[in-house]
Design a protein with these regions (language model features):
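Bacterial N-terminal signal peptides that target proteins for export
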Residues: 3-18
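Short N-terminal segments immediately surrounding and downstream of signal-peptide cleavage
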Residues: 31-50
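Short, well-ordered beta-strand segments enriched in hydrophobic/aromatic residues
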Residues: 51-66, 130-138
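Acidic, glycine-anchored loop motifs typical of Ca2+
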Residues: 71-82
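Short, well-structured hydrophobic secondary-structure segments
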Residues: 85-106
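Mature, soluble, non-transmembrane domains
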Residues: 102-209
Length: 209
């Protein structure tokens, strides 16, 4: 099954931002063996057996989160400075414009084209990790037939990050489907996708809701 990149400029930018955070706080080359762990979470809503919307969440590990947040805090108050945050993110996006770190989707050679419905949002998780939320919808002009198996993956072609699902036992939350079929999450150990994780999801037409 062939991998296809989600055609979403917004998602690309937020992914570039997270990878750039790592590049800015660590001196090691981005194009090297893994230096950190990136966790991914997905919520997919189906309509008529097809993916309709996708909500994505990316979480950096604690070491990268701590050093990135230190760059955003006001040295006097200790609070995150809004102006510093905006300048920081803008600079990182420019620096890392050529890095493609994306969540991918594929189904029998057909691309799932996603478009952003809103600007990505930064957040600080309860455990102190730094992350990004994004909401996407399927471009219906490229919608595929129902009943196929969709492969959702989380990977970093630069090999800076090792990818994990936030909840490996239930990597994807599926709604709009009465009885979805999910395969166990798979971690790729070798080859060009080493360090990535993926999961297969299917919503049969007889299960439409």
């Amino acid at each position: 099954m062939r991998y296809w990149m989600m055609n979403s400029r917004i998602f690309s930018l937020l992914a570039h931002t997270l990878l750039a955070v790592a590049a800015s706080v660590f001196s090691a080359s981005v194009f090297a063996h893994p230096h950190g762990i990136m966790q991914c979470g997905l919520s997919v809503h189906f309509q008529d057996g097809r993916p309709h919307t996708v909500a994505g969440r990316l979480l950096m590990d604690h070491p990268h989160s701590s050093q990135a947040l230190a760059l955003l805090r006001d040295t006097a108050s200790g609070q995150i400075d809004a102006g510093r945050q905006q300048r920081f993110l803008f600079t990182l996006k420019l620096q890392m414009a050529r890095i493609n770190w994306l969540l991918n989707a594929a189904a029998e050679g057909q691309a799932l084209n996603l478009v952003g419905t809103s600007e990505p949002t930064l957040f600080l998780a309860n455990d102190g990790r730094f992350g990004v939320n994004v909401d996407l919808r399927v471009d219906h002009e490229t919608a595929t037939t129902p009943d196929v198996v969709w492969k959702f993956s989380c990977q970093d072609p630069s090999w800076y990050w090792v990818s994990e699902f936030i909840q490996p036992e239930s990597p994807v939350i599926v709604t709009g489907c009465a009885h979805p079929t999910l395969s166990p999450a798979v971690k790729v150990a070798t080859g060009p996708l080493a360090g990535s994780v993926h999961v297969d999801v299917q919503c049969a037409s007889t299960d439409r809701k």
